[in-house]
Amino acid sequence: MDVNNVELIISAVRPEQYPETDLPEYALAGRSNVGKSSFINTMIRRKSMARISQKPGKTQTLNFYKIEEALFFVDVPGYGFAKVSKTEREKWGVMIETYITSREQLRGVIQIVDLRHKPTEDDRMMYEFLKYYDIPVIVIATKADKIPRSKWQKNAKIVRETLDFDPDDKFVLFSSETKMGKDEAWQFIKEGME
């Protein structure tokens, strides 16, 4: 997709704050500091539309990015961040669950994992949660440029096995540095919008 127009419409915490729209939405889920903001910025060809932080746990709201009057990316708080209070994590959990289980415009979730590492228990639980609610998932295995090409398939296999990956879902090797996987990710997103 050729992206020229992107706008952060709202940062929401409750359903009544969600934008009133019929446009399809894709939520972006992933561990804190896994590269969600870098993924968004790569996909929309912007350097800093989604704030990239060295500090995990920066995103604390549902951030609705309208793309080309065609769809929304919804950046959700990263999970698995230990330095946030248990109460705060529980609030985020309720906020994310409410959005994912009740939003009619949601076409799928883009779950971002780090190709360099075996998915965490939090990654596995998120994927299992999405499958329980029968939500289509595009797994983006990011940071592919950080490991030798010869390890890509081995690491991808570990990710798939750890998540108990559903073959009906999509899987993309991705790099924000080289833009590898960008076109493939857009293709899967477009297919889900039809």
Swiss-Prot record:
Entry binding sites for Mg(2+): S37, T59
Xref: InterPro entries: G_ENGB_dom (IPR030393), GTP-bd (IPR006073), GTP-bd_ribosome_bio_YsxC (IPR019987), P-loop_NTPase (IPR027417)
PROSITE patterns, A to Z: G_ENGB
Signal sequence coordinates: none
Entry-linked Pfam families: MMR_HSR1 (PF01926)
Alphabetical keyword list: Cell cycle, Cell division, GTP-binding, Magnesium, Metal-binding, Nucleotide-binding, Septation
SUPFAM superfamilies xrefs: P-loop containing nucleoside triphosphate hydrolases
Gene Ontology CC, one term: cytosol
Residues holding GTP: 30-37, 57-61, 75-78, 142-145, 174-176
GO molecular function, one term: metal ion binding
Gene Ontology annotations of biological process type: division septum assembly
Cofactor(s) required for function per UniProt: Mg(2+)
Location of the EngB-type G domain: 22-194
Reported function: Necessary for normal cell division and for the maintenance of normal septation.
Protein family according to the UniProt entry: Belongs to the TRAFAC class TrmE-Era-EngA-EngB-Septin-like GTPase superfamily. EngB GTPase family.
Name listed for the protein in its UniProt record: Probable GTP-binding protein EngB
Taxonomic lineage of the native organism: Bacteria, Bacillati, Bacillota, Bacilli, Bacillales
